[in-house]
Amino acid sequence: MIRISFLPFLCSALLLTQTGASGKEMPSPYPAPEPGVRLTPPESPAPVLNEPRLFGARPGSPIQFAICASGERPMSFAAAKLPPGVKLNRETGVITGKISRPGTYSFPVQISNGHGKTNGTITIRIGQEMCLTPPMGWSSWYSYSGGVSQENILKTARLLVSSGLAQYGYRYVNIDDCWQGARGGKYRAIQPNKRFPDMKSMCREIHSLGLKAGIYSTPWMGTYAGYMGGTSPNPQGDYSSLALPENKRPQPDQLFGGCPGSQRLGAAKIGPVWMVTQDARQWAEWGFDYVKMDWYLIDVPSTERIAADLKKSGRDIVLSVSNSTPFEIAGPISKTANVWRTTGDIEDHWGSLKKIASSQEKWQPYAGPGHWNDPDMLQIGRLGKVGKANTTFKPTRLTPDEQYFQMSFWAMISAPLIISCDLEPVSYTHLRAHETRRH
C-alpha cells in the first residue's frame, strides 16, 4: 500500500507560478490563467527521512546512495553497522563504496540538526536487481530540449540541490536527445557535440552533488530529433549516405534534420551494424547511471540486447525504454527493462493527462522493485517547445488542480517522477510542489 503526503516543495513550487489550462480537449483559446494555489503544508525545519530508503546494486559495482532528508541545514548523518565496503559522509548523507557479497544489508541511521533528530532504516540489496524504487529526477526534453548543454545540465544539477528537491529523492539529472556529435574515441562510440566539452567531468560534478547522471539514445540509426543513433548503415559508423547536407541541417550535428527527419530519410529503423555495445562502454566510462533508449515499436530482442550491453559495460546503468510499449509484450519487457513507457509523448493539457491516466490500470501487475511502468514526464513548471533550442520558457497550461492530479496519480501508481521544467526562475516558495513522499 502506498501512502502519499505532499510536502512543502515541488508541486506548490511549480504551482504557484501562474498557470492556464483547460479541463477539456485543447480548446482554443485557453481560458485566462488561474491564480496559483498551494495545498501542501509548510516544510518542517526538523529532520524528516524521506524516500527512497532502499537501494539495489550488483555485486562489486560502485555504490552511490544519498540518504534523502529534508529539514534545515546544516544537518548531520550517522549510521551504525554499515556493511563492509561502504562509508557514509556525515555532512552530506551520501553512502559510497562497493559490496562484493550478495545479500540484503539493513542498518539504522540517525539524522539531526538544531531542531531535533529522526531515526530510520536504510536497506542496500546486493544482487542482480537495481532501480528498486521508481526513479525520480529531471530530464531536459521539455525545457532545454534542442539546446541542451553541459552548462545547463550542471546548472540544473546545482538547482536540484540548492532548491531542496534532491532532499525529496529527485536525484537523476537526465540528458535527453540532442547531445550527440560524431562517432569516435577508443570505442568508436557516439561522442558529444560541442555543447558538451567534457562528459566525464560533467558526470563527476553531478556525482559530487550526490546526484546521478542520465543519457539518451536509440537503437535506430537516427533519433527522433535527427541526431546519430546506436546502429549504423556500415561498420565505419558513416551516416553520410542518409544525412542531410550540412547547409540544410538545423544544427551542425543534426544529421537528419528536425523531427520527423529521421523517418523521412530512412534513419528511423535499426540499422545493419549494431553499435550500442561500444556506446554502452563509453557511457560507463564517462560515469552515466541511467539511459533512455527511445524507438518505436519497442521489441523484446532489441531490449534484451541493450540490457546485455549495459550489463557488460562494467557499470550499473538503469535501462529506460521509450516509447509506447505494446501491452502484448509487457511481461517480457518487465523482466528486462527497469522502466518502460506505457504511452506516447505527454502534453501539458487535460486531454493528454486524462487519456494516459485512463490507460494505466492494466499495466499495474507488471510494476515492482526493479521494474516500473512509465506514463511519461511531469508537466509542471515552466516548459519550452520540444525539439527547439529553448532559452525562454512558459508556464505549463495545466491548471493547479490538474497539476496536483498528475503528481497524485503518478505517485499512487508508483510511476517514475521525472520533472522537465526550467528550474532557474523557480523560487524557494515555488518549489513546494514536487515533494512527494512514498511509503
Each predicted region: which residue ranges?
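Aromatic-lined carbohydrate-binding/catalytic grooves of carbohydrate-active enzymes
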Residues: T156, L160-Y290, W295, V300
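Conserved small/polar residues in nucleotide/adenosyl-binding loops
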Residues: T429-H439
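Strand-loop-strand motifs at the edges of beta-sheets in extracellular beta-sandwich domains
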Residues: G85-R101
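A short beta-strand micro-motif common to beta-rich folds, especially ectodomain repeats
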Residues: I67, G103-N113
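Glycan-recognition surfaces
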Residues: P250-L255, L265-A268, P301, D316-D422
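Extracellular interdomain linkers/hinges and stalk-like, low-complexity segments
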Residues: E25-G71, G116-P134
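An acidic-aromatic substrate-binding cleft motif
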Residues: R125-Q150
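Solvent-exposed loop segments of extracellular immunoglobulin-like
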Residues: R73-F77
